[in-house]
């Protein structure tokens, strides 16, 4: 069934016009999902393989995505523009704190490590166990497992 056909079908059921505001497609060996209470946030997680606990693991990672809203899977997924902007913000803050110019680059690199840890999915602290990263969690469930992609949609 096409998306347009499903929308038309649902319009007939609920009696109100439905408009599609966003559409995300994710292809992986296994794709799992999570819809947050209130149906305002939904997320998908692609895993590199299907295994016994794939549904549970992908739901937990999708919950992480809904809660923490990562901007990329890993450092390579963060655009050059975002990186440059964050470095400039860090340097400006350091200048305001009176740090010497020759130290700015090294301190900014440290701040970028923190930025990547907080904003890239595989490096984030796992919300159900802050002693682990998301990578640690998935590898504890299935050695060699990778997250191949993710998507997050929110209403409002």
Question: Where are the predicted features?
Answer:
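N-terminal assembly/interaction segments in proteins that build large macromolecular machines
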Residues: 1-156
